[in-house]
Swiss-Prot record:
SUPFAM superfamilies: NTF2-like (SSF54427). It comes from Emericella nidulans (strain FGSC A4 / ATCC 38163 / CBS 112.46 / NRRL 194 / M139) (Aspergillus nidulans). The lineage of its organism: Eukaryota, Fungi, Dikarya, Ascomycota, Pezizomycotina. Gene3D superfamilies: 3.10.450.50. This is Uncharacterized protein AN9274. Belongs to the PEP2 family. It holds the Pfam family SnoaL_4.
Amino acid sequence: MPNLHSLPLGTRPENAIRNNGPDNLVLERAKLRELAEGWPCYRDACEWENFESIFHPDAVVYTTWSGRVGYKDFIAGSKAGMDNGAFIMHRCHGATTDITADATRAVTKLKATITQRFVIDGIEVDAEADCRFCFFFEKADVDGKGPRWGARFVRHWYEKDKLLPVVPGRFPKIDVDKLNSYPEGYKCLVYCQELTMGVKVLQDMPGHRRHAGTLSGEKHDLLYRLAKDWLDGKEIDV
């Protein structure tokens, strides 16, 4: 029987500091939480200048519909998608941060729900995906104005999702075989995105520990290892 209740050995950043810790790091973690929550709060409200403030200039992000892109390309794609009718919102549920003792690197995990409105065969539905953002933060002076926190990389764990009718009793016909061909953690979201947005969604996005033995399960473990490497001061490619 697979072990679905434990993280892979060696993935916990033992030297990082999290809850409690020195007061100066509590303040730093508060700054990082505000930055992490800025993704859903700023993006959903089209506050693009504020959204840009989350990132360092060379930051890279991953999402289901965009793939791996620079954050400015992600912003451009988000704007184009909105103009074409894409309606994506988020709900934030909680955040944790692991930070180095010298307050130069951190990883913030933000629990959230992605909720996207779709119209399929003239019927409105919401795909809702429970996920965790994973922000790789670094404090650096990138513009000559002094050190500041910014994201270098942003990824997600896509853990489970569902498809809901907007109007009770009205639900479009779903190709269940096609739906079940997608990764378990975000199959409803990707089904609707590919059907309506003209995109090809990546099939190996990180999932939940329960997805062990699948590509999403492998990427789940890899993302934890990358987070540890980041906090250990290593150079990584996400």
